[in-house]
Amino acid sequence: MLKAYKYRIYPNSEQRIQIAKTFGCCRFVYNQTLAYRKEIYEKEKKSVSKTDCNNYCNRELKKDYEWLKEIDKFALTNAIYNMDAAYQKFFKEHAGYPKFKSKHDNHKSYTTNFTNGNIAVDFETGKIKLPKLKAVKARLHREYRGQIKSATVSQVSSGKYYVSILVETEHKELAHTNHNIGIDLGIKDLCITSDGKVYENQKIIKKYEKQLVKLQRQLSHKGKRSKNYYKTKKKVAICHGKIRNMRKDYLHKVSHEIISENQVIVSENLQIKNMVKNHHLAKAISDVSWYELTRQLEYKAKWNGRKYIKIDTFYASSQLCSVCGYQNPDTKDLSVRTWICPKCGAEHDRDINAAKNILTEGLRQIA
């Protein structure tokens, strides 16, 4: 299986210049090949493959723009493949039409492929060998076993540099368990399980809200594109980075526990994009990060031989009695947190009952 290991890197000034050049050239090639593809389609109504785009880059662009030859060839090829993937997504998955990349994008990255030992990680010296960069100082906080396939170098909005090493490795699956669980995703709490376990919503944005408001106020008073503007902008990015890392770390702990203890995991397939259109809930939904939790559950379930099922958004999990199946319309009112079933007399906590129904529906689907 393929697994990525992310490390922070500390390039020297010469390496930073080369990385910046590679970011710029990859963006240039992406935009040029996207424009080429668009032009051919508009003129000739002909589809252009990624191989055609790659040939166009090698035969035309590199001839007209000599400086492209200074850049790692795999990085340019992968930029073209990324453009092609965005194009395919537009046709097959009804995503938006691929956009031209801007040099002002906050997140910059490029990917290079392993060949003839051009990528290597030395845990003794704390350095990573990368094409065109030679040995880059890195914080190698965890080791891996396996064959390197590629490396993605990135720079985030706070200015920090990272490299993600993609490795083909063996993964030992977790031991089989007979325990299954349903999960009700919430805002007050991150999620509640059919066993009655509550995973709290840490509300990380709320903890940093005052600091962010203060920094953003300072930013609005700075002269745009001035030195102080960029300094303050970097502080805002660092604060957002802390929030993102804390949230991700907590979600990894939650998803690991859920996957470790259960064989079948069932949750709702929430339409998050539509839900964040509600301006009253948008910030809370973004902070609780349902998408990231379900993403982690999905890939960790695949890794460990578990089943992760998403049931229909419109399944009436909160209205059904998990004991007898009676549908209680009164529970459409979100303020109803506990209720007694008029048919069988069972007492219910709204969220735990919903989680039990979610589990029942998931198990029914795979029966």
Residue locations for each model-derived region?
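Gly/serine-rich nucleotide phosphate-binding loop at the start of the catalytic core
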Residues: 1-76
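Generic detection of short hydrophobic beta-strand segments and adjacent strand-loop junctions
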Residues: 7-9, 135-138, 198-201
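Hydrophobic/aromatic-rich, well-ordered segments within soluble, folded domains that form packed cores
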Residues: 9-13, 88, 296
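Non-catalytic, well-ordered alpha-helical scaffold segments
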Residues: 17-20, 24-27, 74-81, 252, ...
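Stable alpha-helical structural segments in soluble proteins, enriched in small hydrophobic residues
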Residues: 33, 79-90, 352-362, 366
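Long, hydrophobic, amphipathic alpha-helical segments used as structural scaffolds
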Residues: 34, 38-41, 87, 91-98, ...
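Acidic carboxylate diad motif detector
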Residues: 52-156
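Positively charged, helix-rich recognition surfaces that bind polyanionic ligands
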Residues: 142-144, 157-367
